[in-house]
Amino acid sequence: MSDFLKSIIKSSGNEYAGIASEGIDGSDVTGFIDTGSYAFNALLSGSLYGGIPNNKIMALAGESATGKTYFALGMCKKFLDDNPDGVILYFDTEQAITSDMVRERGMDPSRVAIFPVATVETFRHQAISIVDKYIETKDSKPVFVVLDSLGMLSTEKEMNDTAEGKSTRDMTRAQVIKATFRVLTLKLGKAGIP
């Protein structure tokens, strides 16, 4: 049966397809990133020593100024502590992260790359380019990606409308965000990047 399924998978041309008994590449959880909080670890993974899956996208949601950025930085610190050769790719939409903040939280700033982004399209292009390169690279180092914050990302249409003095609402924003994460979710999972 296995050879039959393998031939079907091969003929599909789907690089992400696989047989469930052999593990589903990008879907099966292979480990966890400790959040630094036993209670939050238990909520997310069912174990005090778990945390966020190391190959899944996770969103921190909450009102403005409730500490989401600081919590994300705490997870970055824990990730770097647990992965001595790991790096952080931090997409910052608010120009909020500084090298001092990184240092003050005990992280080596030479292991944290900050990517200022203003639009969903810019984030999508840069993130997909990085993930594609990561997948191609043999012996890649562990990577943790943070987008802070999704809510602050504009679209190119919104930026253009604002520049032209239009006050119309961009009705395409939700679709652009959804399309971005449809592509990124599969690619990040395949690459094993949280």
Where do the model's predicted regions map?
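Catalytic P-loop NTPase motifs of RecA-like helicase/translocase cores
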Residues: 97, 153-154
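Walker B catalytic acidic pair
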Residues: 149
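Flexible beta-alpha connector loops of hexameric P-loop NTPases
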Residues: 111-121, 159-176
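Conserved ATPase-coupling elements of RecA-like P-loop NTPase cores
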Residues: 154-162, 188
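Substrate-engagement module of ASCE P-loop NTPases
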Residues: 81, 167-194
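Short amphipathic alpha-helices and their capping/turn segments at secondary-structure boundaries
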Residues: 127-145, 184-186
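The Walker A/P-loop phosphate-binding site
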Residues: 2-112, 123-132
